[in-house]
Amino acid sequence: MSQRDTLVHLFAGGCGGTVGAILTCPLEVVKTRLQSSSVTLYISEVQLNTMAGASVNRVVSPGPLHCLKVILEKEGPRSLFRGLGPNLVGVAPSRAIYFAAYSNCKEKLNDVFDPDSTQVHMISAAMAGFTAITATNPIWLIKTRLQLDARNRGERRMGAFECVRKVYQTDGLKGFYRGMSASYAGISETVIHFVIYESIKQKLLEYKTASTMENDEESVKEASDFVGMMLAAATSKTCATTIAYPHEVVRTRLREEGTKYRSFFQTLSLLVQEEGYGSLYRGLTTHLVRQIPNTAIMMATYELVVYLLNG
């Protein structure tokens, strides 16, 4: 792969990630709040014990719409874009690093394994995910802290630089890498996503090639091709997210301030013991509602930019 090709994939990946992050930020905030252990968004329901006449409070997790309503009422619409700054700072380099690493790794592995085989896509996706996570974890930690910083209207909100200073004063440099073990576990989601995506993309390409050969036409990119890529991305991301979602909840808990959660497996075990298996999928609906369009937008933007820059 030439230096120009690498730069094209870097730029295209950055563009795709940025567009997706801006359009889906409110859903990201709601999802992060639902994943956290914060009690401020919980609802206490009173149940009467008809035998003894006593009342018992039962704490339940709010749904996405209730969470959205609480944020709008107590904090205002601007709170739905909490953490967008770090998100934009992180998403462009993260996606750029990811796509560049993925493309480079795939090109090299094609010389070792069968070109564009499942092994190639799996290893490339894993290596790209590992590289991007290691490089950008501090940015995502700050983003999560800002999104969990619930303040009422009129109260001074914590800024990104204040959050950085607070993390450093409390935990030092290692504090910026909390939750990274859960992110590494999440590489499985990335691998599943790209294997399915590349498989669907290949099938679509084979179908179009066969169609153009039958009609004796030259193969050119059309709007329907990008729609197909968006559907491929949405389908693959839905499957991958549903399978690997628990790591998202664990990661959010590990990134909370002053948390009792220390490691990936300790957090996973504690969640199941204290809140049940359902807690591992808290916020999944919101996450899917956000991730499906976000991934579709990101992948289509990436493919479009690569196509335009390569002429």
UniProtKB/Swiss-Prot annotation:
One of its GO terms (molecular function) is pyrimidine nucleotide transmembrane transporter activity. Solcar repeats lie at residues 4-108, 116-203, 224-308. GO terms for biological process: mitochondrial genome maintenance; mitochondrion organization; pyrimidine nucleotide import into mitochondrion; pyrimidine nucleotide transport; regulation of mitochondrial membrane potential. It is found in: Mitochondrion inner membrane. It is a multi-pass membrane protein. InterPro entries: Mit_carrier, Mitochondrial_sb/sol_carrier, Mt_carrier_dom_sf, SLC25A33/36-like. It holds the Pfam family Mito_carr. Inhibited by pyridoxal 5'-phosphate, 4,7-diphenyl-1,10-phenanthroline, tannic acid, and mercurials (mercury dichloride, Mersalyl acid, p-hydroxymercuribenzoate). GO terms for cellular component: mitochondrial inner membrane; mitochondrion. The chain crosses the membrane at residues 7-27, 41-57, 111-131, 180-200, 226-246, 291-311. Widely expressed at moderate level. Expressed most strongly in pancreas. Keywords: Membrane, Mitochondrion, Mitochondrion inner membrane, Repeat, Transmembrane, Transmembrane helix, Transport. It catalyses: UTP(in) + CTP(out) = UTP(out) + CTP(in); CTP(out) + UDP(in) = CTP(in) + UDP(out); UMP(in) + CTP(out) = UMP(out) + CTP(in); dUTP(in) + CTP(out) = dUTP(out) + CTP(in). Belongs to the mitochondrial carrier (TC 2.A.29) family. PANTHER family: MITOCHONDRIAL CARRIER PROTEIN RIM2, SOLUTE CARRIER FAMILY 25 MEMBER 36. Mitochondrial transporter that imports/exports pyrimidine nucleotides into and from mitochondria. Selectively transports cytosine, guanosine, inosine and uridine (deoxy)nucleoside mono-, di-, and triphosphates by antiport mechanism. Catalyzes uniport at much lower rate. May import (deoxy)nucleoside triphosphates in exchange for intramitochondrial (deoxy)nucleoside mono- and diphosphates, thus providing precursors necessary for de novo synthesis of mitochondrial DNA and RNA while exporting products of their catabolism. It is linked to Hyperinsulinemic hypoglycemia, familial, 8: A form of hyperinsulinemic hypoglycemia, a clinically and genetically heterogeneous disorder characterized by inappropriate insulin secretion from the pancreatic beta-cells in the presence of low blood glucose levels. HHF8 is an autosomal recessive form characterized by episodes of symptomatic hypoglycemia provoked by protein feeding, and persistent mild hyperammonemia. Affected children tend to have recurrent generalized seizures. This is Solute carrier family 25 member 36. It comes from Homo sapiens. The gene is SLC25A36.
